[in-house]
Amino acid sequence: MYAPENSANLFKNFTSLTNVTFSKYFNTSNVINMQGMFYDCTSLTNLDLTSLDVKNVVNMSSMFRGCSKLTTIDVGNWNTKNVTTFHDMFRGNSSLKTLNLSSFDTTNVTDMGAMFAGCSKLETIDLSNFKTPNLIKIVTPKYNDWDPNVGLFENCTSLEQVNISNFDFSKTISLERMFYNCKLLSSIDLSTFNTESVTNIASMFYGCSKLATIDLKKFNTSKVTDMSFMFYNCTSASNIDTSLFDTSNVTTMAGMFANCSNLKSLDLSNFNTKNVKAFGTITWRGMFYNCSKLEELNVSSFDTSNANNMYMMFANCRSLKKLDLSNFKTPNLTSMESMFANCSSLESLDLSSFDTSKITITSDDSSTTGLFSDCSSLTSLNVSSFNTEKMTDMKRMFANCSSLKSLDLSSFDFSNVTRYIEFFKGNVSFNVYVKDQASKDFINKVDSGINCVIKEA
C-alpha cells in the first residue's frame, strides 16, 4: 500500500486513536507532504514510526502537534535531507520526555517556527547535529491580534539544557520569544550565534528565572529594532553584559530588564537610543521596572528626544540611590505614569531638562502609584521645567515623599487637574512654593496640613 504524495492531515483530529504501528507494507517512499499528519491525536500514547520512509518528504510542519499524551517519539533513523519546514512539528507535546533527533539533516530547512514550543516535560535536548545554513524562521506568527507570536522553545518549562551550538542564524530575521518561560534553563551557550540579519529579539529570555549569567558578547544587534522584554523576569541574573550592543536602530526597549531583581549594576553608557520611542508600555511595565537590587545604573548616553513612553521606567528600583537624567530631553513624551514610584533609596532627582507639555496623567491605576510616590529618601527634587497645563490626573504624585523639606512647584498649573487624591499623603509638614493664589488654594484643598508659600516671580 502506497501512501499518497500528499499525506497532510492523514490522521488529524483522530482524538480517540491510542496506538499506531505502521507495517512494512505501508510504503511512504513517495510522500512529499506529512504536514499535520497526527495533528491533535490527543489520546495517542504509542506511535511506532520505524518503518516510515521519509527521504522525499519536504513538509513536516505540525506533524505531531497537540499529541499531548505521547511521552516519546522515536525518529532517530529518519532521513530528513529534503525537509524545508519543521514548523510547529512537536508543538504542544506536553508529555514528551525524550526526543532523539540525532539523524536529522536540517541543511535545507528554512522554517523551525515554534518547533518545540509547549514541550513542557522535556528536560534536555541535544541539537548539536543541527546545521541550519538556510534557516529563516524560528517563530510562529500570531493567528490574531490578541495572541502573541510563539518562539522555538517557548514554554519548555522543564528544559534544563539545550545544545544549539551548531545553529547558523545568519539568515534568521527574528529570535523573538526563543526561550520564553524556559524557567529551569540554567545556562545557554550563545558564543556561536551569528545574528547579523536579526531584527527582533523581543522577549528572547523572558521568564528564564534560573539563568545567572547571560553572555551576549558575540551578538550582532546592528539591525535589531525590538528589544522589548528581552530579559523580563530573569530573576537570577546578576550580570548581563550588553557592552557591545549596537542599539542604533532599536525603537522599543519597554520592559527590557524589568523584574531582573538580582541585578546590582548595569552600565548602558554605550547605548544609542536616538530611535527609541518606548521605554515603557501601559500593558506591561517599564524598562527597569522592579530591578529592586539595582544600585548603579548608567544611562548617561541615552537620547530620549524621540521617546513618547516612559511608563514606570524606574518604578520599584528600591536600591537605586543616584540617577543622572540630566541628558534626558523629552519633547515627545506622552506617558510617564508612576515613572519613579517606589524608588525608596533615591536621594535626589533633577528633572529640569524634562518637557512634560504633552503629559495628561501621572499615576498608574493598576498599581495605585503616583509619579514620585514612596520615594521616601528623596531630599531634593527639581521639577522646575514641568509644564502641567494638560495634566488632569496627579493622584498620589508626591505621596510618602517623607524626607522632602521643601518643594518648588512654581511652574505647575493646576487648573485642569481633576484627580489629586493622596497628592501629599504621608508627608510631614514642609514648604511648597507655588506661583499664585489659585495654586495655593489647590494645595490647601489637597492637604490643609501643608505649609504653602506663594513664590514671587
Question: What do the PLM-derived regions correspond to, one by one?
Answer:
Residues 1-457:
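Negatively charged
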